[in-house]
């Protein structure tokens, strides 16, 4: 036993291992970050495979909301957090967890497959190169893929992509990861590649038209059991249909092409969050409709920015930044909205909670801290 442990903790750890695991498996994983601070023994137990095997046997699955942040003090390092609510508090906060030991000035593409979070590609700033003709920085693209096991919050390296990609777009469908764009000289052979998470192998998805891949920056999402890809430059969206690409609903394209991480799909309904409101896509009317019933949710003013959304147990989880000019600080807010489909075809939302979960002080006005918000299902 470690020096200074409470007698009650000592007595608990003296129990047979199978009984200890049985007890810990019944505790919500949201409390694990706090429990891991008790002692090294607790940290070992909470990270052990035996604990997760016990949780599987007990049928204990949870969906946890993860937030990735890039701090102004170290803008190339990605920091990962989990949203946590203490046992004696109603306030929710971001609790830091293990972050991968690599830097990326250009953001990777992020996806979730089961209990694993993938960070795909990205790039380091090319400090030896001059600013390009558009006034933008240039980057050294990466082909690497990092994966976090959300059961233990440990990172591993997955097989690299065949092509290095900077600011790639990624989405998942049926356990396969579709990665689009992010490299120079795109053509019908390298425009998109697919990672099979079961076989851990990459393959290119050839497309029939060079016209589709003339852009450089793409956005993608899985919706209606297929993959949608939008091009910023061409202002057009394509969808895959029976192995072929064709133009998608133009109304859909105009609604989501600003930022794919501000959009999510919940029970086959497309939602997006932006300055002003939360909207869902009405397939019958082929238009975006405001999500009604959000009493209590603050009005999104010009000081709110960088919206992210995720499906959290069938509820809409929203994260955003607020810059507070008088204090020269940036706050990260999170909210959770319950969704209700009504008989007349309308969709309403009920705000369950919203909270200021993180504050960063310093010259952040022109720096986006919030990188992404993702939900992973774990045992």
From Swiss-Prot:
Gene3D superfamilies: Kelch-type beta propeller. SUPFAM superfamilies: F-box domain (SSF81383), Kelch motif (SSF117281). CDD domains: F-box_AtAFR-like. Pfam families: F-box, Kelch_FKB95. Kelch repeats lie at residues 116-175, 176-222, 262-308. SMART domains: FBOX, Kelch. Residues 9-55 form the F-box domain. The keyword Repeat applies. The keyword Ligase does not apply. Keywords: Kelch repeat, Repeat. PANTHER family: F-BOX/KELCH-REPEAT PROTEIN SKIP4, GALACTOSE OXIDASE_KELCH REPEAT SUPERFAMILY PROTEIN. This is F-box/kelch-repeat protein At4g33900. It comes from Arabidopsis thaliana.
